[in-house]
From Swiss-Prot:
It comes from the Archaea. The lineage of its organism: Archaea, Methanobacteriati, Methanobacteriota, Stenosarchaea group, Methanomicrobia. This is Small ribosomal subunit protein uS8. One of the primary rRNA binding proteins, it binds directly to 16S rRNA central domain where it helps coordinate assembly of the platform of the 30S subunit. InterPro entries: Ribosomal_uS8, Ribosomal_uS8_CS, Ribosomal_uS8_sf. It comes from Methanosphaerula palustris (strain ATCC BAA-1556 / DSM 19958 / E1-9c). NCBIfam families: PRK04034.1.
Length: 130
C-alpha cells in the first residue's frame, strides 16, 4: 500500500508518540523535505536529536522526543502564502501570538513563518507545531 501524504503521516506519528510518552519515534519513509522540517523543529526545541537510517528501501528517521510538542500537523492542501497573508494563517493554525511555528517551503528553502517574514518572502504552507 502506497502512502499518499508522508508529511501528514510523520506529523501524526510524532504527535501520537509524544502523547503516549514514548522517548523516540520512527518515521518512514524519509525525504529531504521531512528532514528539513525536523531540523526546524529541533532548532526550536520541540524535538531532541534525530538521525537518518538507510535501510535500503525508503529510509527512516529516528527522532528522540523531548515532550514539548502539544500539537503538530500537516497543512493540506499546501496553500501558497504571500508575505502579507502570514498573519491570517498564523491566527488560524497557532493558538496565540509568538507561540508555535508555521513551517513554509520557500524559494530559500524550508523556513519558519518568522524567518520568512524577516526575509520578506512567502511560500507554501507545509505544517505547524506548538
Amino acid at each position: 500500500m502506497s502512502r499518499q501524504n508522508t508529511i501528514a503521516d510523520a506529523m501524526s506519528a510524532l504527535k501520537n508518540a509524544g502523547d503516549c510518552g514514548k522517548p523516540e519515534c520512527i518515521l518512514e519513509p524519509s525525504s529531504k523535505l521531512l528532514g528539513a522540517m525536523l531540523r526546524i523543529m529541533q532548532d526550536a526545541g520541540y524535538i531532541g536529536s534525530f538521525d537518518m537510517i538507510d535501510d535500503g528501501r525508503g529510509g527512516q528517521f529516528r527522532v528522540h522526543l523531548s515532550g514539548r510538542i502539544n500539537k503538530c500537523g500537516a497543512i493540506t492542501p499546501r496553500y501558497s502564502v504571500g508575505l502579507d497573508e502570514l498573519e491570517y494563517w498564523e491566527t488560524r493554525y497557532l493558538p496565540g501570538k509568538n507561540f508555535g511555528l508555521l513551517i513554509l517551503s520557500t524559494s530559500r528553502g524550508v523556513l519558519t513563518h518568522n524567518q520568512a517574514r524577516q526575509n520578506g518572502i512567502g511560500g507554501e504552507l507545509l505544517g505547524f507545531v506548538y
